[in-house]
Amino acid sequence: KVYEQIESDLIFALQLPDTYDKSDLGRVTSNAAEALLAKTYLTNKKYNDAKTHLNNIIITEKYDLLTDIKDVFDVNNEMNKEILFAIKYSKTLIDGGHGMWLSLSDVTLGHFSDVLKGAYNSDDARAGLLEYKKSGSVYLPMKYYDIQDVSTKDVGNDFIVLRYADILLMYAEVLNEESFDTDINSKNSGFYYLNKVRDRAGLPNLTSLEVPSQSDFKKAVLNERYLEFPLEGNRWFDLIRTGTAKEVIKAAYDIDIPDYRLIFPIPSAEVEKVNNPNILPQNPQY
């Protein structure tokens, strides 16, 4: 029922404008709604629907990968050609900044795991975005680096929710579910779109020599998403969608995750408002 409502809301949101003037910049566009709708369809294995909406975005030619990955997150280059939707912040307003930073006392608590850092090839242009840099009294990962405001002690980069690299990797995933096409130069092949993202990162093309099967390609896309989107809120949902959460967490941290933990509990305040388990039961084992 929840996903039915999400799909319905996003289909309704397709009526939104596809652009806004500067005064309304940051509002959700029809393209952003369509991208999230495609991701919802992908999650629910409605591959043909996902393919249709992802292709709609690609053929607009409004979006593209920036040449340098660092420019995507540059505070002086916000709402660039790669961005479909971003939450806007302002460091000069009280409580207007974001929390993607660590205080000096917390700097040892929020570091990236060796598992993630070790996953990057030495030539991968994305690796440097994980490094922390001091700004005023806080440390920020380079992906969200900004100069701390002297008055509010805050930073104010936009938080990117949807960008074109996500569209390309979702499209690669969908095409692979449709058929395993090994022609890396064909726009009907998932390799074509996967390699676009890899090329921007400075990495060589993958071919059927390195990725010899449909299941291997699915793993390759999941791994590319791991390297492309840290700190962007995608990883958990990618693992759940692909059914690999328990396996990946076990391999990385030797932790066994029980099945019921793969979904979150319904907020207790909402359950208590209804106060009727026949109408709104809590998720099992919570």
Predicted regions mapped to residue ranges:
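Acidic-aromatic pocket-rim loops
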Residues: 93-112, 232
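Acidic/polar-rich alpha-helix caps and helix-coil junctions
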Residues: 1-94, 125-286
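Short, cationic low-complexity segments
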Residues: 104-127
